Every structure is written in C-alpha cells, then in structure tokens.
Amino acid sequence: MGSLLPKLSSGKYPTGSKGVTPRYASGDISSVTGTSGAGRHGYNARMTTFTLQPGRVPLLISLPHDGFFIPADIAERMHPAARRSPDTDWHVARLYEPLAQALGASVLKPQASRYVVDLNRPADGHALYPGQRETGLVSTIGFDGEALYRDGLEPDQDEVRRRIDEYWRPYHQALAQELDRLCNEHGRAVLWEGHSIRSRVPMLFEGRLPDFNLGTASGASCTPALQERLQSCLASQSRFSFAVNGRFKGGYITRHYGAPETGVQAVQLELAQLNYMDEDSFAYDEARASSVQELIGLLLQTCLA
C-alpha cells in the first residue's frame, strides 16, 4: 500500500528523527521510544517525544493529547494556570493501556502537552471546523478562551516550525509506520483515536457534552458496517449518553489516516471527563472509571470482530 505519511504544506512528507522507526519482529512487542534533537526547547540533547507499544492485532490506539510535559523555556513564558496544562486528555492512557494489553493492540502516546503542539491538527494550521472557534496547531489560547502566554511572549513562526519538527513529525512518522506494519501483517488496520474533554466547554459547545462521542468524519473514515456496529454497541446500554458525528466528528488524525478503501479505518472517541475523574482537581476516580473502561473495551472488541 502507499505511504500513509501526511504531506505538509510544502508538499513533502515529514521526515522522522532517528529512533522513530518501530522495532518489531515476530512475537516481539517491546516498547519503542521516539526521540528528537531537542535544541533550545529540550531538557537535554535528545529528548523522548513519544512512546509506542507495538501490538499483535490490527488495532492501533493513538492518544495524541495524553501528554502534559511542557519544556521549561516554554513554560516560563506562560501564565501560571496554563503551566498545569488543564486541557490535557487526563488519564486516557490509564483507561486504554490495560485494555490494549489484554487485546494485544498497539498504543502510541506523546510526552508533551497539546500546548506545545497539537498532534491532532494539520501541520499547515488549517481549521478543522471552519467558522467555529477552536484551538490551533500551536495554540495561544486555552479552552476557556484565556491567553496561554504572557503578553509579547507568544511563539513566532520559527518556533512553530521547530515544534513541528521536534514533536509533530516524529509522532506522525511513528503512527504511519505502525499502520503500515499492521496492514502488511494483517491486511487491514483500525486506528482508534482516544480523547477526553471537560463535560462543559462553552467556547467549543453549548451545554453538557454527551458521555461518549464517536466520530468517523461523518462516515468517511470507516466503513458503514463498522460505524453501525459501534453505534449498536453504544445503543445497547443505557448508563451513558452518546452521539455519533455530533460536535466531535474526528480531528486531523481520524480524517487523514482513515481510508477504508486502503484497508485503514479510523474512529475517534471523545469522552466527557466527569464520567471517570474529578474535572476540577484532575483526580482519577477508579469507581466511575471502571464502567467507562468496560464500555470502551466492548467498542475496541467490536473493531476487531
């Protein structure tokens, strides 16, 4: 199959740094760590930018907003509240990794916060939802609409390009290579985008968000059959509310990599965080999370059926 790597605005494919190529062999699912030359934005000469746990089944779970690390020279220019990275998809790795291990699925997650660079946005900065307010590739505002940086200390275009090189490209290189590997081994692959957000974000949507928000790029990123099976799985329970292709239809990753005709299907799940954590303190709630995790597990199994 053709390369899954996303083209940048230059028309070229992103080139990854050393260390991003997955090391895999028959029966080998050892963890892979991605590194990049950190330059002025790193805490040492080479920094870890993501981790990939290769699996043995045709399912890759991508958690692009799980990271919360902000390099010191970026954090020192931010307002104190922004340094906490409050718009992180808190604890999604804690929800997904036990399920991935049980199923044999691959897991890809970053180290850095979405405030450093948003891995679920196109590298050219084009809007995902034209006409609606949203945060960008290297955002200068948070979900509350407040400025992230102190006056005059926002990143310039050179810094934006460096962040793309150091964080965005290696993640997408690894994602594309892992999908290629799964397709080569199994003839198909499902890319599952795991996300979460506060249940109420007035800047992005009105009222309270449904508990489970499934996005398939309005049906373009997966087959009708898979979308129907996933929707039936959600409809078979009554504990959690859900929406399909509602406010969240799938971000850049779902839209770019989901191409059913090539054997790659992509689905995004946006969870309302109040179902598994305290939205004010960011504390994980084991009791509430267990039911959420159980339903996610059923959805992931549906992808492999």
What are these regions (language model features)?
Residues 1-4, 56:
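Terminal low-complexity, poorly structured segments
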Residues 3, 9-13, 17, 23-26, ...:
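Low-acidity, Ser/Thr- and Arg-rich intrinsically disordered low-complexity segments
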Residues 17, 22, 28-31, 121, ...:
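Alpha-helical transmembrane segments and their juxtamembrane interfaces
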Residues 39:
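Conserved N-terminal helical subregion
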Residues 42-191, 196-305:
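N-terminal catalytic or cofactor-binding beta/alpha core of small enzyme domains
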